[in-house]
Amino acid sequence: MVETDLMSSHSSNWKEIFRTHSIAQTIQLEKFVSQQIEEKGRELQQNVCFNYQSFIEASENLSNIRNNLEKVLQNSYEFQSMVSLPKVDRVSKFLSDNESISQTSGDYFIFLQRFYAHAILFVMELFNKEQYLQSSKLLIFCLRILPADLPNDHQCHILVNRLESCKNYLNNRLKQAMTSSLSKVSVVTSWILLNQANISSGLDIFLQECEDQLLILNDAREFSLTFLNTLKLARDFPNEIRSYLEASKNFNIFKEKEILRNICLDECYLKAYFSAEDVKVTTPFETLQQFDGDNILQQWKLSFFSKISHSEKSFFSNATSLTTLYQILEGLLSELSEPQFKEFYELWNSILQNHFIISSRNIIDSLGLYVNKIKEKLQICFEIPPTNSFDPWSFQLKQQVLNELKQNILPACGMDDGFQRFWQSLASFDMVLDESLQVLKKLQTLHLSFTLGDIIPNYLTLADYLLNFVKTSFAQIYELVCSFVNNVAVMESSSEKQLRTSRCLKIVRLLKQFRHMDESVPFDDLIYKLQNILVRELTDFTTGIYINESKINLDVAACITGNFFGPSFALYNSLIMLIDKLEVLGFDIVSDKFKGLLTPNLFESLFILNLERLKAAKSMDHMKQNTFDMEFINYLSDFTNNPREVIDYQHFIELIDLHVQDEFSKEDFDTVRANVKECVPKLLSFFTVLLPRVKAQKVIT
């Protein structure tokens, strides 16, 4: 301290010092001055981070001082032999110019605080710009220069905690970026550098983060593509990571001009405060060693498949039908590249297959619920009475307007708007089942396994399960409808006639929706039984009209013009009214098959009635008229699928009565028959509705 005071008291008179002190004392003084300059430099560095511009100016001044001082040190030996006034004057002037430098020691810890304040912010800035490697390298540099022997006080703890928090934050952000960032290799490499880990550890962390993301995915397509892409990245990572690590092996912050500029450092400060080892980010040798990546991936897949299998996921739950289920799978397969198929098959056999089968089973089971609703609706549809007291068979279409048809006939037949929609839903159900069967056939072309196992026991394939469902469901429907048909068949009283007809029409329309669904269920037999009931109703209706008209219109003069006969009023009116009823029923009921059942029964009944009338004929005109009607019926039968046998004159006489042979000669019979042949082409177009479609077209032409 005495020496310090002495030197301080004579600092303004350097010439006197040199004259009164030895060379050794002068060198000692030079060292002291150098120490003072260095301390002053550190003091200036403490303030540099507060003001960038001031720092630049101070650094330039300090650089000049240090350069001058280095020259003094390099030539200090000259002081021993060249103590001349000019030299003393120059040294005195130099030191006098810098006498404002503080003589107190600089605080390295204060410098670190100010340095970290800039550096940590820039670390975050680099990371947010997705410059992951630069961000990690800078943070590693910050951690490396932190002294191990910092004072154990509150400020030091704060500084250490800030750095550790920054490292933890970067670690978490890097893990998140492993799945969200496009530059995944850079992210994983940054994590390895930051944690001084090896490639195996980096790959484990990457797979773990990808696993967390995969576990929250529920869409089969997104899940599969993400999984396969993860495997591809994991296989490609090692070589790419090695390239990044090799490039970062000798990272030197002196060469990162942008980093230095943003954290307010330049080369002279780095040299002043840091060693060469401090500014390097080295990579441990074991990081670059070979490792068994395939084994890591295989172990991860086994663990991942186990977690997925024990989860409550349902990858195909968004599929509402087997068609959409197939479209999801087909679309997924179309997006796969050839190298990915092998790994997809492994994923399919381990995870997706069971989910696909479960979703298929759920869809098929939901169709079972639909069947139960159909059965409930059928019960209601069958039991509900006609909406009014309208009798479909007593209604003459030509006497009513179209809106009455909608208001009366259709509701009476169970075909109001609500039931119409019900029929449409049945047709839609038929289409769904047909599409489902087609889908199961398509699945067999995908070369994928569909092992049912314990998910659907007792069945070999999904197709077997669906076919059994169809058979069982429609067997239940058949049993229910069969009870309806039996109920209708025993309704014979006149009071039940209207209800029987209404229910007949309902059930026939219903069965037409079902009969194509399952060939093993005899819906056609029920339709045939109901059609026979309707045929009996129509035949009774027509013959009843014929009998009533025959009683009312006894005069046949209007039907005879000279030797030409036309059909009787009774026959004509009964057939026209029958045609009205067929038009009311609609073409969905009155099919060619139905006409094939109706016309033989109808024409047979009308033929027998004509024979009875012939036997009871009271005049030749009546006999000729009834003969005309009988022959006309036979000619109509020729245009059906069941033509009647042609009757000659002798057989005709035997059928009616032999005693009239003299009254009704063969010439009369042939004349009537010729009139029938002439009349049929003129009148047949009125009756084509009665004929099967092919026959009707033949008649029209």
Curated annotation (Swiss-Prot):
GO cellular component: cytosol; Golgi apparatus; Golgi membrane; Golgi transport complex; nucleus
Membrane topology: Peripheral membrane protein
Keyword Aminoacyl-tRNA synthetase: no
Entry's localization field: Cytoplasm; Nucleus; Golgi apparatus membrane
Residues making up the signal peptide according to the UniProt record: none
Keyword vocabulary terms for this entry: Cytoplasm, Golgi apparatus, Membrane, Nucleus, Protein transport, Transport
Presence of keyword Cell membrane: no
Source domain of life: Eukaryota
GO biological process, any: protein transport
Family label: Belongs to the COG1 family.
Assembly mode: Component of the conserved oligomeric Golgi (COG) complex which consists of eight different proteins cog1-cog8.
Stated role: Acts as essential component of the peripheral membrane COG complex that is involved in intra-Golgi protein trafficking. COG is located at the cis-Golgi, and regulates tethering of retrograde intra-Golgi vesicles and possibly a number of other membrane trafficking events.
The protein's name: Conserved oligomeric Golgi complex subunit 1
The organism of origin for this protein: Schizosaccharomyces pombe (strain 972 / ATCC 24843) (Fission yeast)
The gene coding this protein: cog1
